[in-house]
Amino acid sequence: LLKKSYMPNSRAHWQKLFDPKAVAVIGATPEPQKVGYSVLANLLRGKKRDIYPVSVSQTEVLGLKAYRSILDVASPIDLALIAVRADIVPQVLVECGRKRVPFVVVISAGFKEAGEEGKKLEAEIAAIAKKYHISLLGPNCIGIMNGRSDLNGSFAVEKPLPGEIAFVSQSGALGTALLDWANAHNIGFSKFVSLGNEAGLTELDFFEYLATDSETKAVLVYLEHVSDGEKFMALASRLAKRKTVVVIKAGRSARGRAAVASHTGSLAPADAVFTAACRESGIIVIDSLRDLFNITRLFRLGIRRPLKRLVVLTNGGGPSIVASDAIDSSPSLELAELSEKTKKKLRAVLPPMAAVGNPVDIIGDASAARYQDALKILTAERDVDGILVMLTPQMMTETLGTAELILKFSKKKPLLPVFMGGAAIQEGVAKLEEGGLGNFWFPEDAIRALEALSGSRKKKARVVPTAPTTPSQLRPMEYPAMEKLLRKYGIRLDGTLVRSPRGLASACKKLGRGPFALKVVSKDVIHKTDAHGVALGLSDISAVKSAWEEISRSIKKKHPKAKISGMVLQKMRVGKEVIIGMKRDPVFGPAIVFGLGGIFVEALKDTSLRVAPIDAKAAQMMVKEIKGLKLLQGLRGEESVKFAALEKLIVNLSRLALSDPKITEIDLNPVMATATGILVVDARILR
């Protein structure tokens, strides 16, 4: 991909960012309160590199010779870290360009997040980076870190420990909080990237790089906005095929989106569309920072793929019941069924009072040796994917010895330690941290993390098509043009357009016996029902004519300037009501919605969503994942609807939506689904 960073996608080039031989710190200072001091000091604490402080006021900084300009440095520079006032950055960046520095990290703030003047400055540095082919990270970021190469090119308090997790974040503050927590729990990182305002490099560049980074096994991402929806899905899919990718997205609520806009100057895509795009790309979406931290624990345990069948091993009944309830209520986890052979083995080594079902309760006086006996048997059980090892402190509890055994048996099967308590368990917890496993303080945290990893905690993508927020700018297509467009894509509208009352008699005769429905056709009336523009259950031609007059009066009263193009006459149809629609997302493009219609769409919002294009397989999944599927399959002897017809309609609507970028919304509502096919009873297309 050729992006605004103009960055060659080669390992050697990326090496200059993540393991540079020569680094310049522009804005280096001996004053500890300033960013330039912290960045330089952090670099000096790491692996030996050639480090060049650049300062217009100093000849020496932290024992190193300082240069007035990066141009005064004779040696080539791989990476420049800029920590000067925002208004000076353009000049400094030009000097980096003249020096042919391949990577520049602008840590300085005061750009688009600060208002119009800052926005102009950011556009200027983006143009400079483009001119000189500089791969620019930032501005307004913490910096760059690599736990594997001992690089801390940031002003974070600590550097990351070596590990196999990459963290890519549009929030520097969240990054430093996660880093501090991770260091306290002995969790390492391969790469640690603060994106800042993304004037050059974006999350997409790092998705592309990390897909082939052998040092990274899992990727955590914090996003406030997406720079390019189509490329996001393509690169995220590629990354997710090779690594486990977990994203937490901020700006989901209306209030949250407003905070995002003020913080980064970017608009957030709709939550439901973002979630659908991630799901289609194979990315796990989580809802909370707590889930983010707990999934990081799972990655440290080496758990990067979902576990399903769990055993709870405990020395306390109460906590294990809580854990069992949480597992039982999970859509993606289950308590493993232990074989009679396994239960017999457990009975042979455990006290008579012990419970050998699941949970396996080895009772309160359990020693480390008893935990060992149980773990030896359970870790050999093929039908068990993982074990929650719970411990509560009693007088005879051997927390340290038990922790040592857990470390030993964790090499045979995934073990999730849950040592509950405080001071009495600290020695054991410290041993678990030291050994690289760590501890979940509550069983719910471990279970939530496993659920999130399986995707079952992921918020389901659901939206209900609504009227546009700016109806004065968006108008429905005229009925004949809409009918023609729908027909072109294999979507036939039910009913007959009648231009005047004179045509009602022949239209009724053509349709046969009633009851009938009559609906106004006007590009000036978006919501027909609200304007009393719909009449239902009309028994004969006389009732139809009366309804025409009543609808005409209502429209004239509600919308005096509205032009009525005619009315659609239909037979009242029987079937299962569904809704199929499209809303064009500004980031990801057409989002297709399917769900139950009628009262269900308003009251239950039972819908599924995908980003176009949608093929037959995706359409089938959309239909099957709504909660009301059984209503469509038929209850108490009812016939099932014709699912193939529904799925074909979804695919055709996806094709239509992609054909014209000016179309902002499409509603097919209701669509009557029956055992023999479908009927599109009403439609609306907004352009």
Language-model region placement:
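Catalytic-core regions of core metabolic enzymes
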Residues: 2-687
